[in-house]
């Protein structure tokens, strides 16, 4: 099975065991889409690596689980622009569930990555974006993940938007720039 593949299984969970046993494992239908596409498989590996870092210390959260399950199903069915825009849109919308959602409403032409909000002028630190990069983040904020294929973001702007969001996570949760799978995804989508 590929990373992020959803499956059904019977689990034998015993409190005394550190490792639990699974049997009768069967992939769910949308999981087969990853196996058919090398691009989606590479992207699923990156998402799994990033989620491992970001969610390592997270307590169980049903809303987050629902979001992740729905997002993976959407990505499995995505084609064209929806596939290309998925990473940036997914990581932007994931911020809501991790309690670090940026505030992109109101006036301001600069997004301060440390405060997570718009500002009228650049801050005194280097962690901010402005211009087209700020506009790309606003576009991601306006469009729900399931409609990310409707976004018309040029390839270079999309790559910078993803880099900005990953920097945002690095500031607020954990660094993601050292993931080996990130280089592969960058070569595919940038």
Residues covered by each model-derived region:
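Non-catalytic alpha-helical scaffolds and adjoining flexible linkers that form interface surfaces
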Residues: 1-190
